């Protein structure tokens, strides 16, 4: 089972919230106190909630479900991309396009356009075009890759969202809520936990904290997938023996 511990969280600075004047009262029960006008998050509360979220993700991955990693602010984007790719999950790291979930039909058409352009760039089609046309298509491809590259292999709506900084990604959460897609989110002291099914109270800015969340989630996905593969192997091994008896 995927687990995170108190020492890892302290080292990563998960307990440092935002300035006290920016606090959201809905996060009051997760705040331990204040130090130098900065709210300190109670990691005794975070620990079981973080581990519960990891267990949920591991279970989803074991069932071949898709978890969409979302983190579009500068401090998160690169790590979101790397960790999601490492565990084979879709991601949005650049900008959330309105309707990415609620208007998935249209998004799917844009993904098809992206795939067509990818093929054209590799099969020599671009070489046969005028310089201007080739340049326009290259720019199109670049733009589509940046905004949709992380979800081009998603193949349909995700089964859950994992979000870094719920305030920054509020549109994504609202869309997921409308469609009944569960949301796992890192919620800092200045944010609202509303609309988040699995709240992880913690610092959503520090690179080391963001790295810890994403690394732990990716590990949970990998563990879930490995568990599913192991049980599938066992099932295959047992199946012939049973049919031989029959």
Swiss-Prot record:
Keywords: Ribonucleoprotein, Ribosomal protein. Belongs to the universal ribosomal protein uS2 family. HAMAP family: Ribosomal_uS2_B. Pfam families: Ribosomal_S2. One of its GO terms (biological process) is translation. This is Small ribosomal subunit protein uS2. It comes from Pseudomonas aeruginosa (strain ATCC 15692 / DSM 22644 / CIP 104116 / JCM 14847 / LMG 12228 / 1C / PRS 101 / PAO1). The keyword Endoplasmic reticulum does not apply.
């Amino acid at each position: 089972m995927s687990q995170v511990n108190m020492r890892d969280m302290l080292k990563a600075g998960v307990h440092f919230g935002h300035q006290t004047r920016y606090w959201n009262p809905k996060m009051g029960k997760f705040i331990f106190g204040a130090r130098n006008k900065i709210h300190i998050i109670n990691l005794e509360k975070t620990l079981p909630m973080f581990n519960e979220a990891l267990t949920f993700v591991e279970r989803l991955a074991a069932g071949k479900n898709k978890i969409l990693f979302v983190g579009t602010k500068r401090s998160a984007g690169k790590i979101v991309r790397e960790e999601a790719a490492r565990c084979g999950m879709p991601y949005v790291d650049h900008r959330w396009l309105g309707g990415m979930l609620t208007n998935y039909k249209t998004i799917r058409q844009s993904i098809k356009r992206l795939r067509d352009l990818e093929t054209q760039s590799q099969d020599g089609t671009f070489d046969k075009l005028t310089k201007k046309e080739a340049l326009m298509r290259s720019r199109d491809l670049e733009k589509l890759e940046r905004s949709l590259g992380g979800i081009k292999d998603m193949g349909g709506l995700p089964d859950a969202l994992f979000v870094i900084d719920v305030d920054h990604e509020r549109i994504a959460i609202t869309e997921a809520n409308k469609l009944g897609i569960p949301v796992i989110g890192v919620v800092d002291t200045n944010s609202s936990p509303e609309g988040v099914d699995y709240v992880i109270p913690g610092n959503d800015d520090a690179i080391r904290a963001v790295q810890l969340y994403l690394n732990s989630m990716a590990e949970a996905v990998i563990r879930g997938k490995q568990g599913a593969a192991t049980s599938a192997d066992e099932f295959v091994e047992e199946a012939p023996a049973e049919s031989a008896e029959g």
